[in-house]
C-alpha cells in the first residue's frame, strides 16, 4: 500500500514491529479476546492482534485503506476473526458493537 498518512484524519501509521509487539504484549492480549481497533491504517497492529488469537473489530474512516485491508485480511474476514467497518470511530455508535460478539 503506497499512500501517505493524512494529517487531516490524524493518521500516523505504525511501522516498527518491535513497538507493535510491545503494545500487544503490554495490553495482555490473549486468544479469544475481542479488540476494537480505531483506524487500522495499514494493518500492522491488526496483524499482530490476529496472530495473538484475538478477534478484531477494526473501524477505518479512510476510503483508501478499506480495499487494501479487505484484500490483506481476506481470509481473516471470511473466518470471522476480523470485522472491518468503514466508518468514523468518532461518530460510530458503540451500541452497534453488540451485534459482533
Which stretches of residues belong to each language-model region?
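Catalytic cores of RNA-modifying enzymes
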Residues: 1-101
Amino acid at each position: 500500500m503506497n499512500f501517505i498518512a493524512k494529517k487531516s484524519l490524524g493518521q500516523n501509521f505504525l511501522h516498527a514491529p518491535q513497538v507493535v509487539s510491545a503494545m500487544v504484549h503490554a495490553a495482555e492480549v490473549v486468544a479469544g479476546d475481542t479488540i476494537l481497533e480505531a483506524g487500522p491504517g495499514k494493518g500492522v497492529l491488526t496483524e499482530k492482534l490476529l496472530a495473538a488469537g484475538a478477534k478484531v473489530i477494526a473501524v477505518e474512516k479512510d476510503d483508501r485503506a478499506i480495499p487494501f485491508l479487505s484484500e490483506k485480511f481476506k481470509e481473516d474476514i471470511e473466518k470471522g476473526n476480523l470485522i472491518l467497518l468503514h466508518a468514523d470511530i468518532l461518530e460510530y455508535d458503540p451500541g452497534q458493537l453488540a451485534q459482533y460478539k
